[in-house]
Curated annotation (Swiss-Prot):
All copies of domain ABC transporter, residue ranges: 380-625, 1021-1259
Segment forming the signal sequence: none
Gene name of this polypeptide: sirA
Protein location: Cell membrane
Induction info: Expression is regulated by sirodesmin. Expression is co-regulated with the other genes from the sirodesmin cluster and corresponds with sirodesmin production.
Entries under InterPro entries matching the protein: AAA+_ATPase, ABC1_TM_dom, ABC1_TM_sf, ABC_transporter-like_ATP-bd, ABC_transporter-like_CS, P-loop_NTPase, Type_1_exporter
Name under which the protein is recorded: Multidrug resistance protein sirA
Organism: Leptosphaeria maculans
Residue ranges occupied by any ABC transmembrane type-1 domain in the UniProt entry: 57-347, 699-986
Length: 1263
């Protein structure tokens, strides 16, 4: 559809744009630029509804209530300290002490119940709000994408879209769901602590505020760095995702060229760039937490030292001092835990930057004009139209083009590749805005018309047919969207669909399929042949009876019988309609009312077929070059045997051996009970292997984490000693008074900063290296898989891109912050347990009994989160994969006005998991609330029983506080580990999928060294009695006992109806698949006995739909070199042979010119010729051309055929073709029907037989 481009901007805003002083810059810039917007954390809530805001406020309220529980607990602890001091001094009797202890314990029980309820409500509410708002962002993003002009997508790749719909939105959701509740709870704790502190002792509270100011400053500074580094990391990930999506989309080309290792190596610098920025984010995070915890311990020292001074002045008692000390420090402690939450929030804001920029971008074609109010006649006028593409501002694709297309007439456009033919259609459809000139429809400037209404007046069939995953009926019915028939019943719609399919010559093959019109076509129509897809696309274009038909190589993928039948149908459909036909095959336009011959963006000739044929000029040359060598021809007659259509492309044949890495069975079953093939221990061992080389860093990190965790039991001792010292009648007389313990806290602070900082840095490096290696493994093992693996809809390019970029990233949940927290918490629990047992075993045994409850509750929640993560990720990846598929076909979506339909499909997929998500969230929140509330119950029990032991004089006050403090921090640490349950659950799911991928053994394994290694071959190819099923459960074979062959150096042609098995033979020869039975042999050796890599090195394949990669022309061509260094002269010679040399020389940077994803701004012919040049550089012994010249104009086709004929000397050549002029010079031609050879012979022999081949030649005659 599109015309040449030379360079691809690196983003939607840069790269290949003209310089700022270029006169066309504003016109081109506005077609692709993204608005510059400023995003902060609160911007993430801009799409929340009133209901969601209400639920968020309720959740925030209960989060605040939850946060206030600990300061209230400290208030009671302070009262208990004062009561115990009074009891020790003899100022209150034992009975009063017992009564006050009971009251305090009962109040703490109330706090336990309040915590249980409040945590459940805020957790559940935050998770639901986060899911709802993120889904709203996803929906807005997808709707905005489908609103954009087509030029925007030429620089904004589908890989980036996939990454943003999966990885980036997951980051946003993480920032606005549970994390916000935890953040509010921590802030509430902080505020409540200060409120109590100011009430109890405002002077001491004010002094201790200095430390909190320092903590806040550290958080602000460090968060700024994290946001900056996080944005760089997200940008690097988006670039890598684009490369991944491009690779998986062209997996057949990758396999045919043997590019697996090369592409892995090329991706590595981008993965290293992601690791570079990721490590910086985690380094900053680790040291921020270390400094914050160090400041907390300094605060303890300051409080003890200053509190003692106040006590010396007689201004306050020890209870108030301890209350202020513990309140401010527990507030600062929990506030210090917001570090990971702030990191998540800053990463969420960074991830939203590009997403919100797309959402807020106004398309240059989406002016919002009301639908047209006039009756369309179909008069079209181009007036002085000039056009350039943003990446080539110095090259005019159209130059001052003026032309009238009369209403009700058929106008054909022909010309060489890149002459501007398809650009005319693109501008008429408003895919691009011309840089000058105007286009009128019935006298109305089309830029003033509503773009959707305008496109509804057209029926467009593109050169490369695009179908969407769904039934045939649904695909054809898409053509009715937005028209007067769009809301009709299925019965009425079916009649319209059936009639359109009859005209498009598709009805017979559709009814022959197992499910008829309800047959699923698969991703991109994978279950149908190219010709079948083309006919369905034609039916979709004409089903609504549009006023104007735009046919851009509409019959290029059809066999000759189908082409003739469809052409007759199109002639019928064109009656009374304005029809514009872009064509290379001149046999399809002989009856046009006017034929325009384009050359370099200008009109070179125009007239009828007869007039132009009689004139000396380009058209006459085209006709002469397409003329077939013929015997005496007769008109086609009843002897013509229609092609028998069978599904001719793969639709996943999965068995246990070749199963999906996304599990077995139907999605509903998977939703109910996601299968787990591996135990937790197996997965941990598997993930640990990625950090095997980092064992020294791991040991350093673990040792530092143990020291960091052991600080808290030491803190318990220091704290108890300080309380005893402050409670003493004469603290100054003590050998180790309050000042000594204040100094010990200064020492403890520096130990904590050093140990936690080293821990954070060590695990930061380990986590990012783990992700780097896991991504490398994931990509390499995916490239190892055979083509059959990628035929599975669950392994689409979008889903696999998400797997490498997003899923694998989740493995950090088993490393980094989580690993540090796990070892630190373990050291705290074990250290506290040992200390407590040594100091007071009775109280320890009673209070420690609650920790197993925390662990069980956390474990159950972990399992629930894992289940929820599997369901949620499956839905999001599949829906993102569909969007990616649709964006790749955005021209078809836009031309058919399917934007709203595609958006609604996406929204329905998001809503499909709402009930499951709600149920899992309720259970998960309940168990999490229990794990958070149990420590308060533990404290209640501990204070009651411990105080009772003190009252009985079995324990001293020092023993009591050492044990209780150690147990409190032990229980809190145990609960803190399970706060990472969501991250841990994601990591578990990702580890399982990666393990399944690594364990999967492909049937055709490019890693295998087995088989004979061959340096060269004679090129003798044989297919003997081959039967082949794309689907193991299919009853109809695609190839049915077929036998054919080619002698060394011989050229053979394969022709026949769509679905007859031509391309399947090519796929078997390339060993994309193994035959179900029979033998494919090379030099009389079964190809399965030859090493796959050395086998494919003897072959070169040029596909019907050419694929080029996002790099320079030189790099694209060198992909065919088998790793050999080639000189420029060798490359240029290949370009000359492929008739693309002149075009390359016309580009600003020649061979070093880069272009966008799949070279979308090159014409189909230019892409095809570059693909042929790449094949020539491969110097193959066997050359496979699967419709290799289908996209070429007649001049280029004839030149390329001559070049291929020359290069084929001494090589075996297999040519698959619909256009018989391509294969008439072959040594032997095989005409296929229903997967078997119906006729064979030379062109002359087959013409003499007057069979199906003879009839096909008749149908393509230009005479």
């Amino acid at each position: 559809m599109a015309e040449p481009e030379s360079e691809k901007p690196s983003s939607a805003q840069g790269g290949g744009l003209p310089s700022s002083d270029h006169p066309l810059n504003p016109i081109l810039q506005r077609q692709i630029e993204l608005p510059e917007i400023k995003i902060n954390y609160f911007s993430l809530f801009r799409y929340a509804t009133v209901k969601e805001y209400a639920l968020l406020l309720i959740s925030a309220f209960f989060a605040a209530v939850s946060g206030a529980m600990f300061p209230l607990l400290i208030l009671f602890i302070g009262n208990l300290v004062q009561v115990l001091k009074d009891f020790n001094l003899g100022t209150i009797p034992q009975e009063q002490l017992s009564e006050q202890i009971r009251d305090i314990a009962l109040y703490i029980v109330y706090l336990f119940l309040g915590q249980l309820v409040s945590v459940f409500i805020f957790t559940n509410g935050c998770l639901l709000v986060g899911e709802a708002i993120t889904n709203a962002i996803r929906e807005k993003y997808v709707r905005s994408l489908f609103r954009q002009n087509i030029a925007f997508f030429d620089t904004y790749g589908s890989g980036k879209i996939t990454s943003q719909l999966t990885s980036s939105t997951a980051t946003i959701q993480d920032a606005i769901s549970h994390k916000i509740g935890l953040f509010v709870s921590a802030c509430s704790c902080f505020v409540a602590s200060y409120a109590i502190g100011f009430v109890k002792h405002w002077k001491l509270t004010f002094i201790l505020t200095s430390t909190v100011v320092a903590i806040t400053g550290v958080m602000i500074i460090m968060s700024g760095f994290m946001a900056k580094f996080g944005a760089n990391s997200s940008g690097a990930l988006a670039e890598a995702s684009a490369k991944l999506e491009e690779t998986f989309s062209g997996i057949r080309v990758v396999k045919a060229l043997g590019l697996e290792k090369r592409l892995s190596d090329e991706l590595d610098p981008q993965l290293l760039n992601i690791e570079f920025w990721g490590k910086r984010v985690r380094h900053v995070m680790g040291w921020m937490l270390a400094i914050m915890y160090g400041l907390i311990f300094l605060n303890y020292g300051l409080a003890i030292w200053q509190g003692y001074r106040f006590m010396q002045g007689g201004t306050e008692d020890v209870g108030a001092i301890i209350t202020v000390l513990m309140c401010l420090n527990i507030g600062a402690f929990l506030f210090g835990n917001v570090g990971p939450h702030l990191q998540a929030m800053s990463l969420g804001a960074a991830a939203a930057q590009d997403i919100f920029a797309v959402i807020e971008r106004e398309s240059v074609t989406d002016g919002g004009a009301p639908p047209g109010s006039f009756e369309v006649e179909g008069n079209i006028e181009f007036r002085n139209v000039s056009h350039v593409y943003p990446s080539r501002p110095d090259t005019h694709v159209l130059q001052d083009f003026s032309m009238i297309f009369p209403a009700g007439k058929v106008t054909a456009i022909v010309g060489a590749s890149g002459s501007g033919k398809s650009t005319i259609v693109s501008i008429l459809e408003r895919f691009y805005e011309p840089v000058s000139g105007q286009v009128f429809l019935d006298g109305h400037d089309i830029t003033h018309l509503n773009v959707q209404w305008l496109r509804q007046q057209f029926g467009l069939v593109g050169q490369e047919p695009v179908l969407f995953n769904g039934s045939i009926f649904k695909n054809v019915a898409y053509g009715l969207k937005g028209t007067q028939y769009g809301q009709e019943s299925r019965e009425v719609t079916m009649k319209l669909v059936t009639e359109a399919c009859r005209i498009a010559n598709a009805h017979d093959f559709i009814t022959a399929l197992p499910h008829g019109y309800d047959q699923e076509v698969g991703i991109r129509g994978a279950s149908l042949s190219g010709g079948q897809r083309q006919r369905i696309a034609i039916a979709r274009a004409i089903v609504s009876g549009p006023k104007i038909l735009l046919l851009d190589e509409a019959t290029s993928a059809l066999d000759v019988q189908s082409e003739e039948a469809v052409q007759l149908g199109l002639n019928m459909a064109s009656s009374g309609r304005t029809t514009i036909v872009v064509a290379h095959s001149l046999s399809t336009i002989k009856l046009a009312d006017n034929i325009i011959v384009m050359e370099k963006g200008r009109v070179a000739q125009q007239g009828t077929h007869a007039e132009l044929e009689a004139q000396e000029g380009l058209y006459q040359t085209f006709v002469r070059r397409q003329q077939l060598k013929q015997a005496t021809l007769e008109p086609p007659h009843a002897r013509i045997t229609p092609a028998v259509d069978t599904p001719a492309s793969p639709q996943h044949r999965l068995s246990e051996k070749t199963g999906s890495i996304y599990g077995q069975g139907e999605s509903e079953a998977a939703d109910k009970s996601p299968s787990t093939k591996y135990s937790f221990v197996q997965l941990v061992k598997f993930v640990a292997r990625f950090n095997k080389e980092d064992w020294r860093l791991m040991v350093t990190g673990i040792a530092s984490a143990v020291i960091s965790g052991a600080v808290w039991p030491a803190h318990s001792v220091f704290f108890a000693k300080a309380i005893v010292a402050l409670s003493s009648p004469s603290p100054a007389s003590l050998a180790r008074g309050p000042n000594f313990w204040a100094a010990m806290y200064v020492m403890l602070a520096f130990v904590q900063i050093a140990s936690q900082g080293v821990q954070g840095s060590a695990f930061a490096i380990c986590a990012e290296r783990l992700i780097l290696r896991a991504r490398r493994v994931a990509f390499k093992y995916l490239l190892r898989q055979d083509v059959e693996f990628f035929d599975d809809p669950l392994h689409s390019s979008g889903i696999m891109t998400s797997f490498v970029s997003s899923d694998v990233n989740a493995l950090a949940g088993l490393s980094g912050v989580f690993l540090g927290t796990l070892f630190s918490a373990t050291a705290t629990v074990l250290g506290g347990l040992i200390l407590s047992l040594a100091v007071g075993w009775k109280l320890t045994l009673v209070t420690m009994g609650t920790i197993p409850i925390i662990i069980v509750a956390g474990y159950v929640r972990l399992k629930l989160v894992g289940t929820l993560e599997k369901i949620s990720r499956k839905v999001h990846e599949e829906s993102a994969g569909r969007v990616c598929e649709e964006i790749n076909a955005v021209r078809t979506v836009a031309a058919s006005c399917l934007e709203d339909e595609m958006c609604e499909d996406y929204v329905r997929s998001l809503k499909s998991k709402e009930k499951t998500y709600l149920r899992a969230t309720l259970w998960s929140s309940g168990w999490y609330a229990l794990s958070e509330a149990v420590p308060l119950g533990c404290m209640s029990l501990g204070f009651w029983y411990g105080a009772t032991l003190v009252m009985r004089t079995e324990y001293t006050t020092e023993q009591f506080f050492i044990v209780v403090t150690a147990v409190i921090f032990g229980a809190s640490s145990a609960g803190l580990v399970f706060a990472f349950a969501p991250d841990f659950g994601k990591a578990g799911v990702s580890a399982e999928r990666l393990q399944e991928l690594v364990d999967r053994q492909p049937e055709v394994d490019t890693w295998s060294e087995e088989g004979d290694h061959i340096e060269t071959t004679n090129g003798k190819v044989d297919v003997s009695n081959v039967v082949f099923y794309y689907n193991q459960r299919s009853k109809t074979p695609v190839l049915n006992s077929i036998s054919l062959g080619a002698a060394p150096g011989q050229s053979i042609g394969l022709c026949g109806g769509s679905g007859s098995g031509k391309s399947t033979v090519a796929s078997l020869l390339e060993r994309f698949y193994n035959p179900s039975s029979g033998t494919v042999s090379l030099d009389e050796k079964d190809v399965r006995t030859i090493n796959i890599n050395s086998y494919r090195a003897q072959f070169a394949l040029v596909n019907q739909e050419p694929l080029l990669f996002s790099c320079s022309i030189r790099e694209n061509l060198l992909y065919g070199s088998l790793g050999k260094d080639l000189t420029d002269s060798e490359i240029e010679e290949a370009c000359k042979m492929a008739q693309v040399y002149d075009f390359v020389c016309s580009l600003p940077e020649g061979l070093d010119t880069s272009f966008g994803s799949n070279a979308v701004m090159l014409s189909g012919g230019q892409r095809q010729r570059l693909s042929i040049a790449r094949a020539i550089l491969r110097k193959p012994r066997v050359l496979i051309l699967d419709e290799a010249t289908s996209a070429l104009d007649s001049t280029s086709e004839r030149a390329v055929i001559e070049a291929l004929t020359k290069t084929a000397e001494g090589r075996t050549t297999i040519m698959v073709a619909h256009r018989l002029s391509t294969i008439q010079g072959c040594d032997k031609i095989f005409y296929l029907r229903a997967g078997a050879v119906a006729e064979e012979g030379t062109h002359e022999e087959l013409m003499a037989k007057r069979g199906s081949y003879y009839d096909s030649v008749n149908l393509q005659s230009l005479g």
